Amino acid sequence: MSDLLVVPDAERVAATVVAGFRDVVDFPQPGVVFKDITPLLADARAFATVVEALAALARASGASAVAGIEARGFMLAAPAAERAGLGFWPVRKAGKLPAPVLRREYALEYGTAALELSAGTVGAGERVLVVDDVLATGGTARAACELLEEAGAQVVALAVLLELAPLGGRPRLGDRPVVALHTQT
């Protein structure tokens, strides 16, 4: 499947991603370099470029929905889902949804956390494209994919704006296809 998922005009999209990120050193804690997408979101043309690329991936993958990982994944997945004519499934941080919920705990590069999904959101066998801004260690993305699979979905791919390859996130996702609009090596 991942060989079939090609970003149209990939070089231009990758350049847009690179130009739209800003590094914030020692945030949220010392030793972490936070990848801030605020400049990309503030630039209407850049934002439209990445949203259209994600929508194209959703259409090409045969997804029936797009899931966004809180919080920055929401900003990308919701408009991409709308543009592709698909539903949007929010994968939330723990404690943000009313019961009943499905829950998955995971490790971050700077701590631990949990993700939740409203029970009943996903129909058995539905195909979902999972979207987030950055793939770093893969903990958050893996937890989101496992949560969606537990709910009955088939994850067709994980799509991210930026993959930080040296942090080794892709192998932690197993056989799930990963599409990065730009990979930092």
Curated annotation (Swiss-Prot):
Subcellular location: Cytoplasm
Pathway(s) the chain acts in: Purine metabolism; AMP biosynthesis via salvage pathway; AMP from adenine: step 1/1
Record's keyword terms, sorted: Cytoplasm, Glycosyltransferase, Purine salvage, Transferase
Broad class of the protein's primary localization: cytoplasm
GO cellular component: cytoplasm
Gene Ontology biological process: adenine salvage; AMP salvage; purine ribonucleoside salvage
Domain of life per record: Bacteria
Gene Ontology MF annotations: adenine binding; adenine phosphoribosyltransferase activity; AMP binding
Pfam families documented for this protein: Pribosyltran
Record carries keyword Cytoplasm: yes
Enzyme Commission number, as recorded: 2.4.2.7
Reactions catalysed, as given in the entry: AMP + diphosphate = 5-phospho-alpha-D-ribose 1-diphosphate + adenine
UniProt key word Metal-binding: no
HAMAP family associated with the record: Aden_phosphoribosyltr (MF_00004)
Assigned protein family: Belongs to the purine/pyrimidine phosphoribosyltransferase family.
Function comment: Catalyzes a salvage reaction resulting in the formation of AMP, that is energically less costly than de novo synthesis.
PANTHER family: ADENINE PHOSPHORIBOSYLTRANSFERASE
The name this protein goes by in its record: Adenine phosphoribosyltransferase
Organism the protein comes from: Kineococcus radiotolerans (strain ATCC BAA-149 / DSM 14245 / SRS30216)
